[in-house]
Amino acid sequence: MSVIKMTDLDLAGKRVFIRADLNVPVKDGKVTSDARIRASLPTIELALKQGAKVMVTSHLGRPTEGEYNEEFSLLPVVNYLKDKLSNPVRLVKDYLDGVDVAEGELVVLENVRFNKGEKKDDETLSKKYAALCDVFVMDAFGTAHRAQASTHGIGKFADVACAGPLLAAELDALGKALKEPARPMVAIVGGSKVSTKLTVLDSLSKIADQLIVGGGIANTFIAAQGHDVGKSLYEADLVDEAKRLLTTCNIPVPSDVRVATEFSETASATLKSVNDVKADEQILDIGDASAQELAEILKNAKTILWNGPVGVFEFPNFRKGTEIVANAIADSEAFSIAGGGDTLAAIDLFGIADKISYISTGGGAFLEFVEGKVLPAVAMLEERAKK
């Protein structure tokens, strides 16, 4: 795909507006997982190093649009950036009518979702954003699937619209994994909801040699095989669809599972066959035999696409399945690409970031790209590159 890249431009003295993905978890005013900020830092540093007048912004959480709410302020991100950068960093709350930025200074523009019209890709708001800059840098792959004012609309009106290094790297890595993957290719789709990922499973079934399902998705497949899943999270209305996928694809369904009688961090885990799940139990992880079976499959893979954990890894007693799978991916010689918020949290927890070939910052965008959908922000950048 042909887009203008930020790395090809001279940014010295230019007003540069970077739309990053700084949507990080915050607790008590502190950033609790900095993966997305870390991923955005090289782009920010490159613009500062070139002597640009740099503005960066993002959404954070889901505030009521058009209203300021301290709970969703980018202030914790600003404090984090102050620790990491030697350049001056400041937060600007009201910026739609203009903002002064010095060369080598970083101005963080407050949460874009505080601006009315952001989510609807409002043209007036988009033009106000565009008026702030000479160069618009789209670097938030995680929101590239949404046509919003700060990810899409601004790019139509800015003098120059380009892809930041992070976005460009995402597109290159995903292209490598999906267009001509080294084989065998294994795709892992986990997490809680089947409905949101069934189209992904369908698309992946056409390109992957082996599909692996985990989490609530696996529970639906266990039910499709006629097993009782008790009180487990699963989607009864999608059992027939799971049956269809089982007949058309090679999908290993867990043979053993870890169950509990309550969904809680302190719940004790019982390892048992899928044949023995009781009516008052819920499946919260795959069992050891199932996890080892998946580890063997992953050992022989040449390309691995990983989206979603195979169990409730946030609870220590139901972590083992995801840990075995995560370590198998880390130990594999395959080109591995991982995406999705829960997946990133698991990678952090098990300390394997340096052993994954490429970690995507996108969740929904990652899945939509996998499905072969057009990402509005990318389409806009391609359009602007033609002019």
UniProtKB/Swiss-Prot annotation:
Q: Which GO terms describe its molecular function?
A: ADP binding; ATP binding; phosphoglycerate kinase activity
Which keywords does this Swiss-Prot/TrEMBL entry list?
A: Acetylation, ATP-binding, Cytoplasm, Glycolysis, Kinase, Nucleotide-binding, Transferase
Q: Which GO terms describe its cellular component?
A: cytosol
Task: Quote the catalytic activity from the record.
Answer: (2R)-3-phosphoglycerate + ATP = (2R)-3-phospho-glyceroyl phosphate + ADP
Subunit (UniProt): Monomer.
Q: Which SUPFAM superfamilies match?
A: Phosphoglycerate kinase (SSF53748)
Q: Has the keyword Ligase been applied to this entry?
A: no
Cell compartment(s), UniProt: Cytoplasm
Write down what this protein is called: Phosphoglycerate kinase
Binding sites annotated in the UniProt record for substrate: 21-23, 36, 59-62, 113, 146
PANTHER family (alphabetical): PHOSPHOGLYCERATE KINASE (PTHR11406), PHOSPHOGLYCERATE KINASE 1, CHLOROPLASTIC-RELATED (PTHR11406:SF23)
**Enzyme Commission no:** 2.7.2.3
Primary localisation category: cytoplasm
Membrane-crossing segments per the record: none
- Residues bearing N6-acetyllysine are 84
Which HAMAP family does the protein's record reference?
Phosphoglyc_kinase
Q: Which family does it belong to?
A: Belongs to the phosphoglycerate kinase family.
The gene it comes from is: pgk
